[in-house]
Swiss-Prot record:
GO terms for cellular component: membrane; viral envelope; virion membrane
Coiled coil start-end: none
Intravirion side: 2-253, 203-253, 370-375
Protein name (Swiss-Prot/TrEMBL): Large envelope protein
Name of one Pfam family that matches: vMSA
Region of interest (Pre-S2), ranges: 120-174
Gene Ontology BP annotations: caveolin-mediated endocytosis of virus by host cell; fusion of virus membrane with host endosome membrane; virion attachment to host cell
Family stated for the protein in its record: Belongs to the orthohepadnavirus major surface antigen family.
Gene coding for it: S
């Protein structure tokens, strides 16, 4: 008789029909690379087996939607490994911890509508009445809440990103305020870009107007062209650098820039004078000069809201001086008018002329308005390049 056949129980890792070179997957954890040996080939007694047997059940589409290798998945030919849409019953969680400690699994809590039906009434009055029940209040407020039904403020826990915009549990942000806060700077930026574009066209417009004064019949071709530097036909206001008229165009635009700068400085000077920021002493009666300084003893005290200097003084003759207050507004204008009137006596007639114009009848004013309307288009064509500067001047006048 032959020796009895001894059948050795093959471990799960000994099935090498499916490629598993590193012995990583749960089905082949008894490969030699997974520290399996002939002394412990059995799955139940091998200490090196996987402690997570649920990993064998790969979720549907775990390797991508519809990914099925032609020779089977890496985990075998199971439907789950091949991505077939099959539903596996969920196994209950292991109760090893509960068995060791002697505890039974925690039962599933019944729904709130079965245990506390009064809490499902979302009427405000009934809801607050339901909160009087300690069991209901314990569901909504944490431990240590006040017995009056008010909730103790919980510490706000917010991420770095959310804390920048709003706090957790805070009121929702008002999108109208956010929109208005973003819309304002965008409108200002658009207005600035528009005005800047228009301002950059002022030199070209004034150059065209300046050149048109020499050619009443219209702007002809540039007369600076010659055979030595042939250029295409162009206007005198758009000469290329190769044209001899280019230097004259640059000179005209430089003068125009200086004129615009002078205009802006005059406007700033008028604005500062209107605000009373130019403390200029007026001319003293019967004198063409003034002396500014702190008057310690004055025959007449200065009255006014002048800040610097305290008053305007004449040169003391007998130890005392006459103090005249500085005007709170238009101090420079009054000084220039008095200075010009003292040297040009005919300017005093303009005051009488202005007073006479104020007393004119409405018929005369209608005639003046008609004349302005008749000559207005020509004036508008001349003043149109300066229109973009008007909003800037108005803004400075109001803000300062």
């Amino acid at each position: 008789m032959g020796a009895p056949l001894s059948t050795t129980r093959r471990g799960m890792g000994q099935n090498l029909s499916v490629p598993n070179p590193l012995g990583f997957f749960p089905d082949h954890q008894l490969d030699p690379l997974f520290r399996a040996n002939s002394s412990s080939p059995d799955w139940d007694f091998n200490t090196n087996k996987d402690s997570w047997p649920m990993a064998n059940k790969v979720g549907v589409g775990g390797y991508g939607p519809g990914f099925t290798p032609p020779h089977g998945g890496l985990l075998g030919w199971s439907p789950q490994a091949q991505g077939v849409l099959t539903t596996l019953p969920a196994d209950p969680p292991p109760a090893s911890t509960n068995r060791r400690s002697g505890r039974k699994p925690t039962p599933v809590s019944p729904p709130l509508r079965d245990t506390h039906p009064q809490a499902m009434q979302w009427n405000s009055t009934q809801f607050h009445q339901a909160l009087l029940d300690p069991r209901v209040r314990a569901l909504y407020f944490p431990a240590g809440g006040s017995s009056s039904g008010t909730q103790n403020p919980a510490p706000t826990i917010a991420s770095l990103t959310s804390s920048i915009f709003s706090k957790t549990g805070g009121p929702a942000m008002n999108m109208d305020n956010i929109t208005s806060g973003l819309l304002g700077p965008l409108l200002v930026l658009q207005a600035v870009c528009f005005l800047l574009t228009k301002i950059l066209t002022i030199p070209q417009s004034l150059d065209s107007w300046w050149t048109s004064l020499n050619f009443l019949g219209g702007l002809p071709g540039c007369p600076g062209q010659n055979s030595q530097s042939p250029t295409s036909n162009h206007l005198p206001t758009s000469c290329p650098p190769t044209c001899p008229g280019y230097r004259w165009m640059c000179l005209r635009r430089f003068i125009i820039f200086l004129f615009i700068l002078l205009l802006c400085l005059i406007f700033l000077l008028v604005l500062l004078d209107y605000q009373g920021m130019l403390p200029v002493c007026p001319l003293l009666p019967g004198s063409t000069t003034t002396s500014t300084g702190p008057c310690k003893t004055c025959t007449t005290l200065a009255q006014g809201t002048s800040m610097f200097p305290s008053c305007c003084c004449s040169k003391p003759s007998d130890g005392n001086c006459t103090c005249i207050p500085i005007p709170s507004s238009w101090a420079l204008g009054k000084y220039l008018w008095e200075w010009a009137s003292a040297r040009f006596s005919w300017l005093s007639l303009l005051v009488q002329f202005v007073q006479w114009c104020v007393g004119l009848s409405p018929t005369v004013w209608l005639l003046v308005i008609w004349m302005i309307w008749y000559w207005g288009p020509n004036l508008c064509s001349i003043l149109s390049p300066f229109i973009p500067l008007l909003p800037i001047f108005c803004y400075l006048w109001v803000s300062i």
